[in-house]
Regions:
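Sec-dependent N-terminal signal peptides
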Residues: 4-14
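N-terminal leader/presequence-like segments
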Residues: 3-5, 45-46
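Short S/T/G/P-rich N-terminal loop/turn motif that feeds into the first structured element of a domain
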Residues: 17-242
Length: 242
């Protein structure tokens, strides 16, 4: 039930008022392989005790594909930045140590804020088992970040205009990372057949983009901007741990 709730909150715009502040805490956990199952069970115990009620809930994903494959991502939200002023108490942290850190070799934390304007959220989609995370490697100059965000926002507007079948949420890192991988697109999906033809934008999207924005607009607004202002992107596939 808790897992279904967090997924529903992630992708349903009807629960959270549009334009309200929505933040998710992502902790990437490297498991101690000799006690990996104990880590999974420990996360479940910790989540049930501390993160199963209220507006903010937590869930665990296994990274199947990508640079963090073999690791886990603990996802906590939706939150507001003000929530970080109320840090976990000693008992809470001792439970995290006992059930999670004792079975892990490393943790890294990222705080991501939902960009409503750039996202595309159909009214109802359901709770997916899998997530595709697409993270851009933005160049380290003064204007590349904003240029890339503008492009992603334009794509979101066209997805909305054509009533695209799949949601796409856009999350920005609250705190700048060293490698500038600070914009991530999140695509939920239910089956890997989703990638039989394409692993991103809907089939025929470029044609629709040019129809709405003018001939050659997709190449200028998307292709040229991403070529000039990023060093590409990388994908990761996450699976919900039941």
């Amino acid at each position: 039930m808790m897992k279904n709730l967090i997924l529903f909150l992630l992708f349903s715009g009807s629960v959270i008022a549009q334009q309200s502040e929505v933040v998710y805490e992502n902790i990437i956990i490297t498991p101690l392989k000799s006690s990996e199952n104990l880590l999974i069970q420990g996360v479940k115990k910790h989540n049930e005790k501390y993160h199963s009620t209220g507006e903010t809930t937590a869930s665990l994903y296994s990274v199947l594909v990508g640079k963090h494959s073999g690791k886990y991502i603990w996802l906590n939200g939706p939150m507001k930045m003000a929530d970080y002023d109320d840090m976990p108490d000693t008992a809470h942290m001792e439970d995290w140590q006992k059930n999670i850190r004792n079975h892990a070799t490393d943790e890294s934390v990222k705080i991501a804020k939902l960009n409503w304007d750039a996202s595309y959220s159909p009214p109802s989609w359901g709770s997916p088992k899998y997530l595709l995370w697409r993270t851009f490697k933005i160049k380290q100059d003064n204007d590349s970040y904003q240029k890339v965000l503008e492009t992603i926002t334009k794509i979101g507007k066209v997805l909305s205009a054509i009533n695209a079948p799949h949601p796409r949420r856009v999350y920005e890192s609250v705190f700048r990372s060293e490698d500038r991988e600070d914009i991530t697109l999140v695509y939920p999906f239910k089956t890997f057949t989703r990638f039989s033809e394409s692993n991103g934008l809907p089939e025929g999207f470029q044609v629709e983009y040019d129809r709405i924005n003018g001939p050659g607009a997709f190449r200028k607004d998307v292709g040229d901007v991403l070529s000039l202002h990023t060093n590409g992107w990388h994908d990761e596939v996450l699976m919900l741990i039941e």
